A protein has these predicted regions:
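Bacterial N-terminal signal peptides
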Residues: 2-11
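Beta-strand-rich, non-transmembrane domain signature
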Residues: 20-200
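Charged, amphipathic alpha-helical interaction segments
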Residues: 11-14, 104
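Sec/Tat signal peptide C-region and signal peptidase I cleavage site
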Residues: 15-19
Length: 200
């Protein structure tokens, strides 16, 4: 009876847990987009297309990338209280790639009108915890200079994998037309934590 009650409780709480995960990711994505769009990058302000590139399907007008890696090592107090000597090692990686692209024809329009990517992946066992999150940011710059940021509400979310550990997002970019510029970035955050026995 207790087992059945436990299973029922798990079934009742799982949807709420999934909903919480989606909400946490949404907030993370919103904060990431604010941070990236606020970066002072002069190369993204000069959006003129040189005449020699006007017949190209798409022209990359600016590109920016950065990679940040941090490492932490700490003693696992919880494991110590249980009679084990564990050292936790955590590595965090933040990887950003952003580019500004001029859309000149239908082929380029098709290529940059839809995106499909894995937004979040979680893996965990007794040896390690791994979390991966990816955020897509898109802005459309019209020929008159008007900037339209694609709302978070336009991103469609789904889950797959064992225990819904993989969160997918899809985006059909609304309002993108030939002659527009698309300002786009991918931000990848990876956190890996290893649990190792202290060799002493």
């Amino acid at each position: 009876m207790l087992f059945l009650m436990g299973v029922l409780a798990l079934l009742l709480t799982t949807p709420n847990a999934n909903a919480d995960d989606k909400e946490k990711y949404k907030l993370f994505a919103e904060e990431t987009r604010k941070e990236v769009w606020a970066l002072k990058l002069p190369e993204f302000t000069n959006t003129a297309v040189q005449d020699k590139y006007k017949d190209e399907s798409a022209v990359i007008l600016a590109a920016h990338s950065r990679l940040e890696i941090t490492k932490k090592t700490r003693f696992n107090v919880g494991a110590f209280l249980g009679g084990f000597h564990y050292i936790d090692r955590e590595v965090n990686c933040r990887d950003l790639y952003r580019m500004l692209v001029q859309i000149n024809d239908k082929a380029a329009l098709k290529e940059f009108s839809e995106f499909d990517y894995k937004a979040e992946i979680r893996k965990k066992d007794w040896r390690y915890d791994e979390n991966y999150q990816q955020v897509l940011g898109v802005r459309i710059i019209k020929p008159d200079g008007t900037v339209n940021e694609i709302s978070t509400d336009e991103y469609m979310t789904a889950t797959e994998g064992k225990k819904d550990q993989e969160q997918l997002q899809k985006l059909a970019v609304p309002g993108l037309e030939i002659g527009d510029k698309i300002d786009i970035f991918f931000f990848n955050y990876t956190s890996l934590e290893n649990h190792n026995l202290d060799p002493f």
